[in-house]
Amino acid sequence: MTPASRLKVQPGERVLDLCAAPGGKATELGAALQGEGLLVANDINTARAKALLRNLELFGISNSFVTNEPPHVLAERFPEFFHKIMVDAPCSGEGMFRKNPAVVDSWKEKGPEYFSKLQREIIVQAADMLLPGGMMFYSTCTFSPLENEKTITHLLKERPDMEVVPMEDYENFAEGLTSYKDEAFDESCKLCRRIWPHKMSGDCLLYTSDAADEG
């Protein structure tokens, strides 16, 4: 049920984990490659990228390398290159409030409005690195529709060759929203899946699978 397992990586594919540190998802993606193909694990934070590198080395993911670049730089270097892309986006962390009250202070400084803008930039840049017919998985650990369904709606407007594809359901998964207050989102956002902490053990998450058109 992890985000990495939902991406269904196959041996021999080229895979990007765009916001990868500290490496839990990256190591799972790397293991799925079974030593074949390529994993690029990126994090914009230098200290976190070093931790990411250590974890990949500890897990013996030899067909990987770590980058420490903003997404737009990677997008310039790897246009239409990857079969699979993981975007576990930086977010306001509302789903972590119960686990870590200190996140509330960070949220007051940089809330959903700040991260929504950042996510909209990241997801389009990520889409530009996806091969035709490839798959991208977007996830956050926050409740805000601004950081979830609004981000997906923005992607679908900017890259109309992309579509949201259904994923296997689990009990207590909730559909994504198609509207919030006075704002409407793309109808396909109902294919997104929300995990609520009062319905399932753990933190709040949103999962979305985006597939590039074969075009």
Model regions and ranges:
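Glycine-rich nucleotide cofactor-binding entry segment
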Residues: 1-81, 113-118, 165-199
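Residue-level signal for inorganic ion chemistry
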Residues: 19, 52, 85, 134, ...
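A structural alpha-helix within SAM-dependent methyltransferase catalytic domains
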Residues: 30, 124-127
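Helix-to-beta-strand junctions that scaffold the AdoMet/dcAdoMet cofactor pocket
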Residues: 34, 130-131
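Mobile active-site "lid"/loop adjacent to the S-adenosyl-L-methionine
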Residues: 47, 84-124, 141-148
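Conserved beta-strand signature within the Rossmann-like core of class I S-adenosyl-L-methionine
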Residues: 135-139
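Conserved Class I S-adenosyl-L-methionine
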Residues: 149-169
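Conserved small/polar residues in nucleotide/adenosyl-binding loops
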Residues: 207-214
